[in-house]
Amino acid sequence: MQPLSRGEGRRQEGARLDIFAKCGILFLFILPGLPGAAGLQKEMSSMKYAFDNANLIDGTKDMRVQPGLCVLTDGGTITDIVPAGTAPAGYTRIDLRGRYLLPGLINMHVHLAGSGKIQKKQRDNEKLVRRILSNPVSRAVAYRMVCGFARDELLGGVTTIRTVGGLSTFDTRLRDEIAVGRRVGPRILAANEGISVPGGHMAGSVAIAAGTIDQALAQVDAVHAQGADLVKLMITGGVMDATERGVPGELKMPPEMVRAVCERAHALGYTVAAHTESPEGVRVALENGVDSIEHGAK
């Protein structure tokens, strides 16, 4: 995949923003992601704002459009919702002029190593990742692309993402840079590299290939040292790297490894997410301590 030129990136970003403008829709706290310095995101999180004259869609089960409202924020936190035109003194007023205001969306399953577009043909991702991470120049290019994919999430209205397998320590690095205002992007809960087995799903690309329980536990300790937010397992085969029918749901990780990883992760205060694409994979995950099932396809 070739990185966009600066001009191409600006044109695509402008097109996305134009779509939002035409639809008259704003996602709450997406404003820091609009054109401007990353410092604006940090500034927004430390000031008082009144988003006035909004048509509010609050995200509840029985949500209806609620016209004529003003959303008050302080330090990046919603503090009140009041009638339009009644914001108290001390707030910077932003007149939405009847645009629709939504809560930020949350994407619970993200791999920032990819754009999310459909892969047209099989690739040797392990070989590709090894080549990318082998020198500083290609690493820098790859990290820039990861940052761009995260920004795309924000521009699409996603204000929080949960990564479940990434390149090296890119995800925690980007999470921390966004948190201090160096980069523009959503809040990130990061797993960094997941844990697979030799020949398993994403082994060698966005997950390490653990041949033994000790190697799997070493990766749990590694992501703990990296400051990750969760642990990711690849229990069954997957669709994207399957070379023959039946592989996606095939059990790859032994149950005893799943249990050992979950016990170590839980002792360190982590939850464990697991890629499973078969009833057998789901059963192994649930019986051995996994906290969340990813995909769960049959």
Regions found by a protein language model. Name each.
Residues 26-29, 39-88, 99-102:
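N-terminal metal-binding scaffold of metallo-dependent hydrolase/deaminase domains
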Residues 54, 71, 76, 98, ...:
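Divalent metal-coordination and catalytic microenvironments
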Residues 100-177, 288:
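Metal-associated gating/positioning segment near the N- to mid-region
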Residues 114-142, 184, 192, 196-204, ...:
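Active-site gating loops and adjacent loop-to-helix segments of metal-dependent hydrolytic enzymes
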Residues 135-136, 145-171, 185-196, 228-242, ...:
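Divalent metal-dependent hydrolysis catalytic cores, especially in the metallo-beta-lactamase
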Residues 142-150, 211-223, 277-281:
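Short, acidic/polar
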Residues 198, 237-298:
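Active-site core of metal-dependent hydrolases
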